[in-house]
Amino acid sequence: MPHISASEALSHITVLDLTRVRSGPTAVRQLADWGANVIKIEPPESIEPDGSLGASRDTADFQNLHRNKRSLTLNLKDKKAIEIFYKLVQKSDVVVENFRPDVKDRLGINYSKLEKINPKIILASISGFGQDGPYGKRPGFDQIAQGMGGLMSITGAPGEGPMRVGVPIADLTAGLFCAMGIQTALIEREKSGKGQWVTTSLLQAQIFMLDYQAARWLCEKTVPKQAGNNHPTSVPTGVFKTSNGAINLGVAGETIWKRFAEAVNKKEWLEMPEFSSAKARLENRDSLNGLIEEVTLKKTSEEWVDELEKVGCPCGPIYSIDEVFNDPQVKHLNMAKEINTDPFGKTCLVNQPFNLNRTPNDFKQKPPIKGEHTKEILNELGIKDDELSSLEQNNTN
């Protein structure tokens, strides 16, 4: 079927998607879900079997990453296929790739080449460590970036050694930052009339996500340590056991500290010197946390959330993934959005985390079968049906 825009927001933009695994597809998903005409370009099955790089098509992971796209198979190592790719570049706005940096040069699809074909083209590249430099040629993996980006040194309980986070955060954030870079370049192009090369890496994204923890080192020369579920500087903030589980508390600042102490019927804490200021509470974190947990163990998580919310004290339950999607607010936000897919039939995938009131997004196209739209897309380029069979015989597509 022809491209059906998932939103009017980016329906005027055509994107050539050369990405694989996670960081690149995450970037392209942001464009596809907001209406861009995304053409996912993949090697033919004979060249690269399904699942060789990343999740196979029948997994929830693949389905969640690749909705709202069409699929074209092209063997970019073939001369005729590269000619077809160049024709696509002439008619497109954005090319996104996350190959190792030198692959673009070998294939003849680096920015200097694409810019000559279409001066308005935006090439977006995600790498492990940057396009050049001492580590420029290294392949990038999320867990490696989590370690080299410092995140694992501040994740987990004190003394237990480095710990990765439960999602591929470097991949995901590199993809999101890449999408932001693309959108910035598209806006700038309206002024200059020119494209440009957008680059980011897993390492850059991970370091940026350190945020205030990185700033503590850069400005104060403080090396943050593992703090488990405790906040590094705000006390009491963390996880506290209840009679049927645990809750998160975020008691930051003197006003909320006072509300909290009164709500749990412990006004005497307000008079104790060891808890009289934020600095004092930080220095006496362990003793204060112990006293708080003696109190929170006396009621259920639901009771504490209800009572503390009434007095404006930040708190919340700690959900498993199934509980997340059963929460009434999550349902209200429509974070699980319906779609029909080939492997799962009618199911739900994770929706976008922001809304546009005039140009909302939707799931208009199920994740494609490899090469599902090859004939259609090549016909749009002016390649006739009688040429397609010879292209297939030559492993061009």
Task: Label the model's feature ranges.
Residues 230, 235-311, 315:
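Aromatic-enriched alpha-helical interface/lid elements that frame and gate functional surfaces
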Residues 45, 129-130, 202-207, 244-246, ...:
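Glycine-rich beta-alpha junction loops
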Residues 2-6, 276, 340-390:
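Flexible, small-/acidic-enriched active-site or ligand-binding loops
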